[in-house]
Every structure is written in structure tokens, then in C-alpha cells.
Amino acid sequence: MYKNIKKFKLESFIAQEIGNLIVSRGIKDPRIHSFLTVVKVEFSKDLINAKVFIGSIKEGASLDNAVKALNNAKGFIQSQIIKRIKVRSTPKLLFVKDDSLSKSFYVNKIIEGLNTIREN
């Protein structure tokens, strides 16, 4: 039970810190824009590896390039996280593209289209 609570707190903290770095432009890479969002963070059972799912709230944004840039900057990101958290070792980060936001935008467009057809 305790490990699950610790894991949940660590996942939410990591997501928040990475989100803050993205929004505050702490990562100096033009491929990383403020429309990126951390969808979720999943830790391995041993809390050594963390998979960070990245989405974009802007339609048509180049998510592939942003994920590559984040993976290139993961050493810097890990160093920033270790300054703010008290753990024995920093989790190894892996950034992964998450299309769930773009899919939800697509579904919303379809629903809006159906609503306009219904109104006419």
C-alpha cells in the first residue's frame, strides 16, 4: 500500500516538474513549445525507469520532433528534477508520444459537425 502511494506521488510530482520546465521555457530547444503537455507518467515497479507520455494541445503541432527533443534533453531534465526532490536516484526518463489529445480533438470535431447538421 505504501509503495503505491509513494509511486503515485512521485509520478504526479515528475509530471508537474516536467510540465513546469516546458511551460517556463526552461528547456532551450525550439522544437519544444509551450503547447506540449505531460499526459501521464508511468514508473516501473522498481521506480528506476519512468515513461513520460507527451501530448500537444495544439492541433497540427509536430509532436514527433518535440518528443525527440525531450529525449535529447532528458539528462538536463533529470538534473533539474533531482534538485527539487529527495530520492536516492533520479528515475531514467523516456519520453513517448501520446495521441490521445489529438484523437479527442478529432472526436469533438465530429460531434460538432453532427450538431450543426442536426440544427440545419
Curated annotation (Swiss-Prot):
Q: Matching InterPro entries, A to Z? A: KH_dom-like_a/b, RbfA, RbfA_dom_sf, Ribosome-bd_factorA_CS
The UniProt entry's GO biological process terms, in alphabetical order, are: maturation of SSU-rRNA
- Primary localisation category: cytoplasm
Q: Which GO terms describe its molecular function?
A: ribosomal small subunit binding
Q: Where in the cell is it found?
A: Cytoplasm
Q: Which GO terms describe its cellular component?
A: cytosol
Pfam families the record matches: RBFA
Q: Which UniProt keywords apply?
A: Cytoplasm, Ribosome biogenesis
Keyword Ribosomal protein present in the record's keywords: the answer is: no
* HAMAP family referenced in this protein's UniProt entry, alphabetically: RbfA
Q: Which family does it belong to?
A: Belongs to the RbfA family.
Q: How does it assemble?
A: Monomer. Binds 30S ribosomal subunits, but not 50S ribosomal subunits or 70S ribosomes.
Describe the task this protein carries out: One of several proteins that assist in the late maturation steps of the functional core of the 30S ribosomal subunit. Associates with free 30S ribosomal subunits (but not with 30S subunits that are part of 70S ribosomes or polysomes). Required for efficient processing of 16S rRNA. May interact with the 5'-terminal helix region of 16S rRNA.
Q: What is this protein called?
A: Ribosome-binding factor A
